[in-house]
């Protein structure tokens, strides 16, 4: 029986990697070895940045809340502490949305936090 060298399997494997590398710059979408390296890096970046995205959004929300809180005469930490004392459970995402889109509602929350801090 003749030896099977696996040409079909190898071609399929290479084709799959090159298909994943479609749109990459330069040799990274043409040459198998560089494409394979770039695809591996891309998977790593995607995995890493799915986690980084959560941290980035939390930072953005805190920055927005802090800016709005300072417009109401409080720091971010004072506002959050005051809201906790007032037993108002609003997450940072919603607070940031209120700060940007509904200043009156945010001011009401800030006033409630101030009232609890004063006691």
From Swiss-Prot:
GO terms for cellular component: ribonucleoprotein complex; ribosome. The keyword Calcium does not apply. Pfam families: Ribosomal_L20. GO terms for molecular function: rRNA binding; structural constituent of ribosome. Keywords: Ribonucleoprotein, Ribosomal protein, RNA-binding, rRNA-binding. The keyword RNA-binding applies. GO terms for biological process: ribosomal large subunit assembly; translation. It comes from the Bacteria. Belongs to the bacterial ribosomal protein bL20 family. Binds directly to 23S ribosomal RNA and is necessary for the in vitro assembly process of the 50S ribosomal subunit. It is not involved in the protein synthesizing functions of that subunit. This is Large ribosomal subunit protein bL20. The gene is rplT.
């Amino acid at each position: 029986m003749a030896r099977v060298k696996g040409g079909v399997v190898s071609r399929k494997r290479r084709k799959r990697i090159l298909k994943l590398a479609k749109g990459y710059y330069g040799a990274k979408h043409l040459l198998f070895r560089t494409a394979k390296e770039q695809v591996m890096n891309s998977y790593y970046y995607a995995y890493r940045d799915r986690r980084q995205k959560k941290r980035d959004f939390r930072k953005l929300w805190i920055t927005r809340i802090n800016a709005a809180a300072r417009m109401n005469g409080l720091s971010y930490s004072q506002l959050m502490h005051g809201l906790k004392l007032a037993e108002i459970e609003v997450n940072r995402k919603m607070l940031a949305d209120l700060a940007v889109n509904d200043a009156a509602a945010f001011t009401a929350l800030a006033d409630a936090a101030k009232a609890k801090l004063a006691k």
